């Protein structure tokens, strides 16, 4: 049976955390890197930090030239699909992971999915920035998350 390799990344303004799992052997590894919010550090640095985290996770799982089935990135600072697509393509180039195996979401959307899967609910992110996101009856609402210049009340930003 082919090993199914999954990598999840939480990309933020303070730090980047990545976790990987090989579902055949149930091995789980975790690594932390520096900030990778593309709105703060730029697309190039963001992509490089995330790619380094992905590489560390895959190396820890014992792969020299791994091909994960999916790399899912929840990234702060990614507020539209075109920006997410630019980050996805750049990350693919740097990591060597095929672009069709990389998905990039806004961090608060990824947080919602991790808690509620496809059900209704509300989540808040209160880190370097702040944002609240909810889904109900097929509709979504996002409040905040616009950065410190426009207002990040409730965040840890100084």
What are these regions (language model features)?
Residues 1, 100-123:
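Conserved phosphate-binding catalytic cores of ATP/NTP-utilizing and phosphoryl-transfer enzymes
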Residues 5-52, 140-141, 145-147:
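Short glycine-rich, Thr/Ser-proximal phosphate-binding strand/loop in the N-terminal lobe
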Residues 6-10, 68-72, 121-125, 132:
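Short glycine-aspartate micro-motif
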Residues 16-21, 113, 124, 130-135:
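Short beta-strand scaffold segments in enzyme catalytic cores
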Residues 22-27, 86-96, 118-122, 137-142:
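A glycine- and small-aliphatic-rich helix-loop capping segment at beta-alpha/alpha-beta transitions
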Residues 30-66, 77, 81-86:
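N-terminal phosphate-binding loop and adjacent alpha-helix
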Residues 42, 120, 131-158:
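Glycine/GP-enriched mid-protein hinge/lid loop-to-helix segment characteristic of carbohydrate kinases
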Residues 58-95, 101-104, 115-116:
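Short beta-strand-loop/turn "lid" adjacent to the catalytic site in phosphate-handling enzymes
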């Amino acid at each position: 049976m082919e090993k199914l390799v999954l990598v999840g990344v939480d990309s933020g303004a303070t730090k980047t955390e990545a976790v990987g799992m090989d579902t055949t052997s149930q091995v789980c590894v975790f690594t932390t890197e520096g900030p990778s919010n593309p709105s703060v550090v730029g697309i190039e640095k963001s992509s490089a930090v995330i790619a380094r985290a992905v590489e560390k996770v895959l190396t820890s799982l014992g792969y020299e030239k791994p091909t994960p089935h999916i790399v899912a990135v929840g990234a702060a600072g990614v507020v539209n699909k075109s920006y997410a697509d630019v980050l996805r393509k750049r990350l693919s180039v740097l990591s060597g992971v095929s672009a069709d195996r990389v998905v990039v979401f806004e961090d608060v959307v990824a947080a919602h999915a991790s808690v509620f899967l496809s059900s209704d609910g509300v989540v808040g992110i209160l880190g370097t920035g702040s944002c609240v996101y909810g889904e109900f009856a097929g509709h979504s609402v996002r409040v905040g998350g616009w950065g410190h210049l426009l207002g990040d009340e409730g965040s840890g930003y100084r």
